[in-house]
Amino acid sequence: MIARRLVSVPLFATVLAIMAAPGRADDAACQAVLQAVLKQTAAPVHQKVTIETAAAPDKPMHNEMIRLGDTLYMQARGQWMARPYDAAKAADDARQAMTKGEHSCTRVRSEAVDGQPAELYRVQSKTATGGSDSQVWVSTASGLPLRQTVTMLEQGTVKLKHEVRSDYTNVRAPADVSR
């Protein structure tokens, strides 16, 4: 169930959910991450996702997502599905997420991702039951997220880890899609 829910939500929302707080929303590092995530809402992208849960730490799940225009394609357990996607709504949801929780953002360093120059940011959030620690690599050329890692905590215990790698070149709809 948790994998299905995570795969059905665009990954940029995950980053925004973890960095939601008005107190630091104007911080330069937080703004850089937010701008990258907002830009990603409208960009064609192919994402490869790895998810590890506390319940099955040695059995990572591998999924893919492709966003093209008004369609989000999701692959889980080898099967592709298509769902409607609204970039404007996704951007609005991202902006609204900035009003929740408590977070801090830090620019860590310049670091290449698959040969592409990028800036690495660390985003930490706190919630009533735990929080998360994320790293987001933003391309210096395009301003889009290239890689994201998130560790979600609940009462000090790791509940979930996921990594997302994003590719913006030659993005095409998958063959064999069920609707």
Question: Where does each model-flagged region fall?
Answer:
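Short loop/turn motifs at secondary-structure junctions and domain boundaries
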Residues: 56-57, 101, 127-130
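Edge/loop elements at the starts and ends of beta-strands within beta-rich repeat scaffolds
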Residues: 38-45, 114-116, 141, 159
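A short, amphipathic edge element
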Residues: 96-108, 165
